Amino acid sequence: MARTVPLERVRNIGIAAHIDAGKTTTTERILFYSGLVHKLGEVHEGTTVTDWMAQERERGITITAAAITTRWTKRDPKNPSQPLAGAPEYTINIIDTPGHVDFTIEVERSMRVLDGVIAVFDSVGGVQPQSETVWRQANRYNVPRIAFVNKMDRMGANFLKVYNQIRERLKANAVPIQLPIGAEDEFRGIVDLVRLQANIYMDEIGKDIRPAPIPEEMKDLVAEYRAKLVEAVAETDEALMEKYFAEEDLSEADLMAGLRKGTISGQIVPMLCGSAFKNKGVQMLLDAVVDYLPSPIDIPAIKGVLPDGSEVSRKASDDEPFSALAFKLMSDKYGDLTFIRVYSGVLTKGTYVLNSTKNKKERISRLVVLKADERLDVDELRAGDLGAVLGLKDTTTGDTLCDENAPVILESLYIPEPVISVAVEPKTKADIDKLSKALQALAKEDPTFRVSVDPETNQTIISGMGELHLEILVDRMLREFNVEANVGNPQVAYRETIRKPVSRVEGKFIRQTGGRGQYGHVVIDLEPAEPGTGFEFVSKIVGGVIPKEYIPPAEQGIREACESGVLAGYPLIDIRVTLVDGSYHEVDSSEMAFKIAGSMALKEAARRANPVLLEPMMKVEVEVPEAFVGDVIGDINARRGQMEGMSTEGGISKVNAKVPLAEMFGYATDIRSKTQGRGIFTMEFSHYEEVPRSIAEAIIAKSKGSGVTN
């Protein structure tokens, strides 16, 4: 089957923002105006297409990244209500991502497979903590983006305030290509700075849009921001710069070409405005998506590693060998769905492919594209497509699927570590097996959700990104798997690390039991690594003092020993282990012996290397009426918090601090009682930091007395 839409007319985009900035409503309006749905869905009524899980509709938040395919034809500038005659149709694959920090992995895995992002900002709140997190994630994968300042109809809406915040707090080159006409109740239209025309909304559902002259009172402001736009575009290209110096202006075509080039290269973030809920600005936003965000062929070719370790690029083309990345797993009543982004080649139903990450073959029995929870069967997925495969056996998030005859492993995802744990136990004996199956299914879907068993208490421990994350997962166990469970109090995911390097520490495992014995001997150096690096292993074995087949088992033993540190049994992180020496026995050496020797060496080295306990520090932003700010700051200090700044605007104070997670349990209730219900806060993981000695001693003593949950 031939490609129906050429690759240059495909857009893979995400819609991402802080919670409550209006991402899901923006997505719903995109689906409405592009004709995919014929009735407007509302988050507060629980009728949206992309929020399809029961918990999402109840809570009014997006939890999972929902993928949807729609079509768009550009509007006619002279009659913005209508498509441009003869204009081609574009395919837009959209992923609506969560804004709550507990669901960061959903945003992370979406960013990995997207070509462009619409970053939605609340016109009142502006740049909020999760906006910064989303921005960092987009930076990590170099994703081009456009900014949509939403909710221009809200009390306190201020487009230019958000413009300044994006430039100052996100350090981004935000360039308005629109200005709002009016704000709050008076918001009635948008000035297009590229075409220098006003567009006025004449009806409530945003379908009757009429061009008009720029209002007299806005002419100076429009001239100022048009000049900024022209200058920013000129700086992206030498030829445009010369033209700008010669003529002091650029044509509409020059501006659009320069904006596209600057957006795709990350030099420019075009800024648009509107009110998705009031149906204003969404069609122009869609035009900007096709005008300025990249197609799969505009972005650098995906890089991968061949079986021999050499690097290779796979271009976005149907003619290249097939390669795809699995970015999300989902189970529902129809079976297991694996969402994939096809980077090169064609995937056809009924064929076999290789999961090169696990070196397993997978059969492609069914392929679907999604309209949220509705599935449309297709025969193939081509380069640049987002879709899902049903019934894969061994594939998990971050795995590469590829042509068996052209194996490659694509760069995977960054997966953050869980910071909070709780014990769960089934309410009845009948629930024991069901609990185990439910936890396995949920852990397979969500790589930030971990399941372990405490070796001392034999309790099942679940770990995740925050209290809401675990609450939703426990709720899903009840709804989807019919499992009732008792849930313990939250526990902090402490970690251990070392403060000084130690060299030439031996691990020797010798056992003679009659017949063949066991012999493994390794010598390691252990040193602290950069915070955030986790675990690094380097082998400097030369001359065959340890045969190469015994080095991976030694590394495995070292890695497994890191799972339970020497102070309190918490995982050991941010260390570098170098295998420097060892010996072996021709007859008695085995993989198991070297695995045990590696584990022994690591434990001994960690004891000597000044081990310390680490705790997760959270980035906390509290918004309270000015009158309560003194109490809030005092409370943060009492929680061992470190103040990082404060600002006050319109009688509302924003307090920024870093606070240990251990001190933040129950804060939602405390902040409400301290501020008469008027305080709100957001919290996200920042980094690990050493626990003060007196507190560390108590944690270590408790872990030795009662077992440890990690």
UniProtKB/Swiss-Prot annotation:
Domain tr-type G: 8-297
Keywords linked to the UniProt accession: Cytoplasm, Elongation factor, GTP-binding, Nucleotide-binding, Protein biosynthesis
Alphabetized GO MF terms: GTP binding; GTPase activity; translation elongation factor activity
InterPro entries linked: EFG_II, EFG_III, EFG_III/V, EFG_IV, EFG_V, EFG_V-like, EFTu-like_2, G_TR_CS
Keyword GTP-binding: yes
Gene3D superfamilies reported for this sequence: 3.30.230.10, 3.30.70.240, Elongation Factor G (Translational Gtpase), domain 3 (3.30.70.870), P-loop containing nucleotide triphosphate hydrolases (3.40.50.300), Translation factors (2.40.30.10)
Record keyword Protein biosynthesis present: yes
Compartments it resides in: Cytoplasm
Binding residues annotated for GTP, in chain numbering: 17-24, 96-100, 150-153
Entry-linked PANTHER family: RIBOSOME-RELEASING FACTOR 2, MITOCHONDRIAL, TRANSLATION ELONGATION FACTOR G-RELATED
Family: Belongs to the TRAFAC class translation factor GTPase superfamily. Classic translation factor GTPase family. EF-G/EF-2 subfamily.
UniProt function note: Catalyzes the GTP-dependent ribosomal translocation step during translation elongation. During this step, the ribosome changes from the pre-translocational (PRE) to the post-translocational (POST) state as the newly formed A-site-bound peptidyl-tRNA and P-site-bound deacylated tRNA move to the P and E sites, respectively. Catalyzes the coordinated movement of the two tRNA molecules, the mRNA and conformational changes in the ribosome.
Protein name: Elongation factor G
Species of the source: Synechococcus sp. (strain JA-3-3Ab) (Cyanobacteria bacterium Yellowstone A-Prime)
Record lineage: Bacteria, Bacillati, Cyanobacteriota, Cyanophyceae, Synechococcales
